[in-house]
A protein has these predicted regions:
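Catalytic machinery of carbohydrate-active enzymes
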Residues: 1-258
Length: 258
């Protein structure tokens, strides 16, 4: 099985790898061609006989298939999406303890921008919009933003309940260790929500008016990650209504955690 598309796609569809191994078929070895950066997430996957970034020298095999073609070949429907969670676990349980912030009971990780690509403008919620939540009591907001956009949080870290973890994210295994300590990950559509969802950490996904295909339309849940929720723009570019919808939902969590 060889990877394709981006990191989020790989994390979302790797759930199908154990299904291949469990098929009622002659015994076979399963090789997974995976980007080096993601390999630490699969160290305990017994279904894989070999995992590597094979590049231009793949092993000799009898069959091969792109990762994202597996749902079609296995006849997946909305009702049969493999949704047992978690299917990824934190491989670095002793890596890093997220610093507690005084007076808070709820840890919320925030991500507001995707990689700078063709869909960048559509997949960015201005940090100023998310900052409208920073006045909420009892919530610690932790910046999980990667890349150059992480610096945008610097204007808000003087607040006692806002802290950037950009310098601690490291590799995907380090990021997983941090995500595991969050109560909620509030993020635009990027690989972070797939990593959180696969670990069964609630991802609250902020979606543009015209979302990616995997999130469907007219629903606030997702069959891919049963513990996660979708918050959709009501008009193109309207992130304010998304934040307005999220605020009372956070208040419910605060009440439950006090």
């Amino acid at each position: 099985v060889h990877w394709e598309q981006g990191f989020g796609d790989i994390i979302q569809f790797c759930r199908y790898l154990p299904l291949i191994k469990s098929l009622d078929a002659p015994p076979a070895k399963l090789f997974f061609d995976c980007p080096d950066k993601l390999i630490p997430l699969f160290t305990d996957w017994d279904c894989l006989d070999e995992i590597a970034d094979f590049g231009d020298t793949p092993p000799e095999v009898d069959y091969f298939i792109p990762l994202m073609s597996l749902p079609g070949r296995l006849g997946t429907t909305l009702e049969t999406i493999p949704a047992a969670m978690p299917y990824l676990v934190n491989p670095l349980s002793d890596y890093f303890e997220v610093p507690p912030l005084a007076g808070t009971t709820l840890k919320v990780g925030i991500v507001w921008a995707s990689d700078h690509g063709a869909s960048y403008r559509r997949k960015v919620c201005p940090i100023a919009e998310i900052a409208n939540l920073f006045d909420m009591k009892h919530i610690a907001f932790y910046g999980l933003q990667f890349g150059e956009d992480a610096r945008e949080l610097d204007s808000y870290t003087a607040r006692e309940n806002v802290h950037s973890l950009a310098n601690d994210l490291g590799g995907f295994d380090h990021t997983a260790a941090i995500i595991e300590q969050m109560d909620v990950v509030l993020s635009i559509d990027t690989y972070i929500v797939h990593l959180a969802g696969a670990m069964n950490i609630p991802a609250w996904i902020m979606l543009p008016y015209t979302p990616d295909w995997r999130w469907f339309l007219d629903r606030s849940d997702t069959p891919w990650y049963p513990g996660s929720r979708l918050f959709r723009q009501q008009a193109p570019g309207d992130w304010a209504s998304v934040i307005d919808t999220i605020r009372p939902e956070l208040e419910v969590l605060i009440a439950q955690n006090r």
